[in-house]
Amino acid sequence: MARKYFQREVLPVTALVIMECANVGLNTLFKAATLKGMSFHVFIVYSYGLAALLLLPSLFCSFRSRTLPPMNFSILYKIVLLGIIGCCSNIMGYTGINYSSPTLASAISNLTPAFTFLLAVVFRMESVSFKRTSSVAKMLGTVVSIGGAFIVTLYNGPVVIAKSPPSVSLRSQSTNPNWILGAGFLAVEYFCVPLWYIVQTQIMREYPAEFTVVCFYSIGVSFWTALVTLFTEGNDLGAWKIKPNIALVSIVCSGLFGSCINNTIHTWALRIKGPLFVAMFKPLSIAIAVAMGVIFLRDSLYIGSLIGATVITIGFYTVMWGKAKEVALVEDDNKANHEEANEADLDSPSGSQKAPLLESYKNDEHV
């Protein structure tokens, strides 16, 4: 029982928090690489190509598996669609970071839970009833988490820990045309992310093989982005050359920890917990970005960051409570239905006659 609880409750939370920390670091590394002149289209092609190579052995295991269903057209169609969504999401996201910063990317990602919740309701993956406290908790927690993330983004307040001269805030940068353009690209990305969650969840219901699906997905993203790169870069072969500097480090780290491990963990979490659960970890990224800035970059810590992080935590745990409440209600309903079915079998005439018929059959054999 304890092992099952750890695998279904503790492990997904721990893994997704670690992945949000990794994503903040990978976005910062990507920004440093693009400042050296690397094309972000080429970056996407190489990082997802590396992930596909790392996951390639999983294809042989899945095709030899007897427990998995056959890879039919419906599944392949959804994987192709997933690759197109992933290509659009990555291009929009990295374009946005290129025009703005990783911190703004973390801030705009707070729109993900709201978009995911709406799409999950539309596709009937989440139920909403104002009469149930679990549904109210999910809606309220989603709004509170988004609000807390925007507090971190837009409100500084007094300095709590002053380690360096005050850095330029998101609010002061909001008048920069490039910053606004970057925010627009990032908003499109974080509308594509919930679509990715929804489609991936549907694929997992039909074909529960995370490594195989992510491998095909990585091939698809690399292929579609390569076509876009041929159009954007033209005959510039120099854009495809990667120098042994921060660009190479960024591609390797993103391919291993981002495209490979991160996507696999998110796919696994989508299969066992659903899209809204996974999306609720996005507001944590802005708090993680602030914490990493204070610890590693010696940024100043403001009271607004502390207030916002507290609000995010309250909203996050409110949604988690609502999800746990729903799971408990479903389990209670299933248990009650099972008990009613057993009682009906015992009370039915056919159930009461099973023993006499068997006894009669035995007596006939001895005659």
UniProtKB/Swiss-Prot annotation:
InterPro entries: EamA_dom (IPR000620), WAT1-related (IPR030184). GO terms for cellular component: membrane. Its main location: membrane. It is a multi-pass membrane protein. It is found in: Membrane. The chain crosses the membrane at residues 10-30, 40-60, 73-93, 103-123, 142-162, 179-199, 211-231, 246-266, 276-296, 301-321. Pfam families: EamA. GO terms for molecular function: transmembrane transporter activity. Residues 338-367 are annotated as: Disordered. This is WAT1-related protein At3g28050.
